[in-house]
Amino acid sequence: MSKRITIEELQSYLWNSAVLLRTNIDAGAYKQYIFPLLFFKRICDVYDEETAKAVEEYGDDASEFDEDEIHTFIVPKGYHWNDVRAVSENVGVAIVEAFRKVENANSDKLQGIFGDGAWTNKNRLPDRLLKDLLEHFSTKTLSIANCPEDELGQGYEYLIKKFADDSGHTAQEFYTNRTVVHLMTEMLNPESGESIYDPTCGSAGMLISAIAYLKEQGKEWRNVAVYGQEINALTSAIGKMNLFLHGVKDLSLIHISEPTRPL
């Protein structure tokens, strides 16, 4: 049974996950841990939702389909959110293993997306703290029915801004004031079928704004080629997650990379 999550509930849920880290992690590093866990939770909840829909529609025949015919992202057996949640010792190791397995199972889309946070450093992230984080995120089901893409994307953007506000001078590498971004988007006036390129895309705010602009205009946005370039690997991963959470899934249209020269 679905239970819609309001924007207010979502924002509180997301920010309270960061509050759990405050005594152990510097504010500038929140994004290394909260964003990957949020994305992993979303992937697994949507995976379960897609499985249930396939069984409802096809019954026993659902097992005849290849996983990629049913699922947006594949979650390998034994590496689902619930499997990680069940671990009581060496939780950081279990998280890293699940991240790598999911990345490898979706290598054309997700390679490197979970970053390289120090999950196994028990001085910074003891098992107790990681268990608390997992239990906190487990209090809500982040299915599409409960939290549509645009709304979860809005929550993600809220968290990006909160992290930027908390981390001060370190924020400029991944966050641009959204008022400026929206003004630039209106000046750009993107159209359906065009290519949109941001050479310093950060967390992909400009690219997301361009897609949102087309949606608000009632124009087709799925045929827009979106390109971004970002030299910082962590920020690039945040940008990829941002695009995915906003419903931009076709990675043949998305190129967030870290080259030293323009695309």
Predicted regions and their residues:
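Conserved S-adenosyl-L-methionine
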Residues: 170-257, 261
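Non-catalytic, mostly N-terminal accessory regions of nucleic-acid modification and defense proteins
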Residues: 1-192, 251-253, 257
